[in-house]
Amino acid sequence: MKYKRIVFKVGTSSITHSDGSLSRGKIQTITCQLAALHHAGHELVLVSSGAVAAGFGALGFKKRPVKIADKQASAAVGQGLLMEEYTANLSSDGIVSAQILLSRADFADKRRYQNAGGALSVLLQRRAVPIINENDTVSVEELKIGDNDTLSAQVAAMIQADLLVLLTDIDGLYTGNPNSNPDAVRLDKIEHINHEIIEMAGGSGSANGTGGMLTKIKAATIAAESGVPVYICSSLKPDALAEAAEHQADGSFFVPRAKGLRTQKQWLAFYSESRGSVYVDEGAEHALSEQGKSLLMSGIAGIEGHFSRMDTVTVYSKATKQPLGKGRVLFGSAAAEDLLKSRKAKGVFIHRDDWISITPEIRLLLTEF
């Protein structure tokens, strides 16, 4: 078995008709493949969009609504209808499904993050298939994850999946938009995600990318940095899920980081909210970036913001003003500033176990998406 634990993400277009309504036929195609993989011994998670599409017609809307309240109401109705369809199909094959609705707050709060990961682990151990969506009905725009590509990558990283498969209506990442550029070539294997890759996907003001591809590159970055390989492939092929599971998919494959980030480091890098800024001298910069050591109080050159003990802060080089990483502090800002003023600044400020260096890929996540 090439990949045992797999997260599949299907977008709204993969399970709806051209008029935006839910397609039971498309859902059945997906669940039949999931059932076959489940019976073959794979552990599966499905991240599925489509709640609004499933619900807007039942509320009497003639087309997909655009107002936030209308979309949230449609999602409230549609999520149940969507789960009903998935549950009925999977249960006919003797498979238990579970609904999990997540929001950005579930990742930002460390305890909730750990609890969600624990629940998912139990479900997979008990051979259930978790079906996950963002909690659209209660999420406010400013606090949303924003897209299920990102959510699927966060889940894949959280449970240390063996593979993330992003199913879409295009068979991978191209050098240009294949719908308008006949010279566009698909990239079958991507080893490093950089500015050029982002531009191909439609970032940095580019007009070359295809709709939705940029969020998939963001998702691939999160997953690959966490040690999870990623496929972007078309959901239109009848055996797309099975082919991806055996590393035979017709799509773009993203090679993961050789040593993926542990769960604690993932949380620091991608989800923890920075409460302040700390500037360090050259000696501390070298110790953090080159030697993998803890940040000592004696290396601090300046503090900005108000934070408490065990809050996350961003650490910058005093010389270059560039971010070096993020970490959880052992002193609040007030206590640290008092120690610095008294010239009794001794001890560890950020332990190396609570520190993550900002790699070029993580820097792209912070600046480009």
Curated annotation (Swiss-Prot):
Residues annotated as binding substrate: S49, D136, N148
Entry's localization field: Cytoplasm
Assigned EC number: 2.7.2.11
Enzyme class: transferase
Function: Catalyzes the transfer of a phosphate group to glutamate to form L-glutamate 5-phosphate.
UniProt: ATP binding residues: K9, T168, D169, T210, G211, G212, M213, L214, T215, K216
GO cellular component: cytosol
Catalyzed reactions per annotation: L-glutamate + ATP = L-glutamyl 5-phosphate + ADP
GO biological process, one term: proline biosynthetic process
UniProt GO MF annotations: ATP binding; glutamate 5-kinase activity; RNA binding
InterPro entries xrefs: AceGlu_kinase-like_sf (IPR036393), Asp/Glu/Uridylate_kinase (IPR001048), G5K_ProB (IPR041739), Glu/AcGlu_kinase (IPR001057), Glu_5kinase (IPR011529), Glu_5kinase/COase_Synthase (IPR005715), Glutamate_5-kinase_CS (IPR019797), PUA (IPR002478)
Residues covered by the PUA domain: 275-355
Lineage, opening ranks: Bacteria, Pseudomonadati, Pseudomonadota, Betaproteobacteria, Neisseriales
Alphabetized Pfam families for the sequence: AA_kinase, PUA
Family from the record: Belongs to the glutamate 5-kinase family.
Pathway: Amino-acid biosynthesis; L-proline biosynthesis; L-glutamate 5-semialdehyde from L-glutamate: step 1/2
Record keywords: Amino-acid biosynthesis, ATP-binding, Cytoplasm, Kinase, Nucleotide-binding, Proline biosynthesis, Transferase
Taxonomy, superkingdom: Bacteria
Protein name (database record): Glutamate 5-kinase
Organism of origin: Neisseria meningitidis serogroup B (strain ATCC BAA-335 / MC58)
